[in-house]
Amino acid sequence: MASTSRIDALPKVTCPNHPDALLVEDYRAGDMICSECGLVVGDRVIDVGSEWRTFSNDKAAADPSRVGDAQNPLLSGGDLTTMIGKGTGSASFDEFGNSKYQNRRTMSSSDRAMMNAFKEITNMSDRINLPRNIIDRTNNLFKQVYEQKSLKGRSNDAIASACLYIACRQEGVPRTFKEICAVSRISKKEIGRCFKLILKALETNVDLITTGDFMSRFCSNLGLTKQVQMAATHIARKAVELDLVPGRSPISVAAAAIYMASQASAEKRTQKEIGDIAGVADVTIRQSYRLIYPRAPDLFPADFKFDTPVDKLPQL
């Protein structure tokens, strides 16, 4: 009963010239218009209906249609805020002419910092074609580090870059420091420092990288055939099994194995070409190559078709 009486007490909006005429509501403009004479009899009408929008690129949701913006559970306010529009009447302003209902707080400084970091993470990921699950894991890692305040003095961009590196390794699609450095504004050394600090702060770890983690991508970027890729993979694995490359990074061993396999085939690649793709210096490739060269006959797969015999391979 109370609800009915309240509704009945509300003033009825009608056209002064045509009280019985139907009113047409313009949802976009927020106007009530007389259907007889076109007079606007009410303005600033609130549309209480749902504002359904379709986001075709929103891969995270099964249904791309939703009301309003996507909720971000990583933010303290859930990324849902209300903006109060400025009034037009004198009652909407104080004696100094300022709006009485200013939006004092639309987003906290911490949420704003995280939003900026999330945008940077997405931009970096897009530039090296990383999937959504990597972005989500990176965002979660950044949130944990940010809330712990354990890396004070380090820039958010550096922390975000290191989190992206960690997320890639945890998801089984590792990227090199140089690859992350290339899509960020942070030096390789600074990313490496943040990487170690984050692992310590979160008391987490990452799987050790192997030569196989990079071989397919490096060979593909170099335009090498499957035969050369399989040979390089076999060479690198045998070199590790025979303990020919103690202390050498898997990336440098992979680069040296690719160099050896390509030089034995008709698809020869220079040290510089391989170094540019792998993100290692020519001298680093040479050092690893010299360690595996003496055992070259034992490293190639039995069915490899040589274009250049083993004894004719570069000795460097």
Curated annotation (Swiss-Prot):
Q: Does the keyword Repeat apply?
A: yes
Q: What class of enzyme is it?
A: transferase
Tell me which SMART domains the record gives: CYCLIN
Q: Where are the sequence repeats?
A: 124-200, 218-294
Example GO molecular function term? zinc ion binding
* Compartment(s) where it occurs, according to its Swiss-Prot or TrEMBL record: Nucleus; Chromosome
EC number(s) given by UniProt: 2.3.1.48
Mind telling me which GO cellular component terms the entry cites?
chromosome; nucleus; protein-DNA complex; transcription preinitiation complex
Record InterPro entries:
Cyclin-like_dom, Cyclin-like_sf, TFIIB, TFIIB_CS, TFIIB_cyclin, Znf_TFIIB
Q: Which family does it belong to?
A: Belongs to the TFIIB family.
Q: Please give the record's comment on domains.
A: The zinc-binding domain is necessary for the interaction and recruitment of RNA polymerase II to the core promoter, the formation of a fully competent pre-initiation complex (PIC) assembly and basal transcription initiation. The C-terminus is necessary and sufficient for interaction with the TATA box-bound TBP complex and for the formation of PIC.
Q: What does this protein do?
A: General transcription factor that plays a role in transcription initiation by RNA polymerase II (Pol II). Involved in the pre-initiation complex (PIC) formation and Pol II recruitment at promoter DNA. Together with the TATA box-bound TBP forms the core initiation complex and provides a bridge between TBP and the Pol II-TFIIF complex. Released from the PIC early following the onset of transcription during the initiation and elongation transition and reassociates with TBP during the next transcription cycle. Associates with chromatin to core promoter-specific regions.
- What this protein is called in its record is Transcription initiation factor IIB
What is the organism field in this record? Xenopus laevis (African clawed frog)
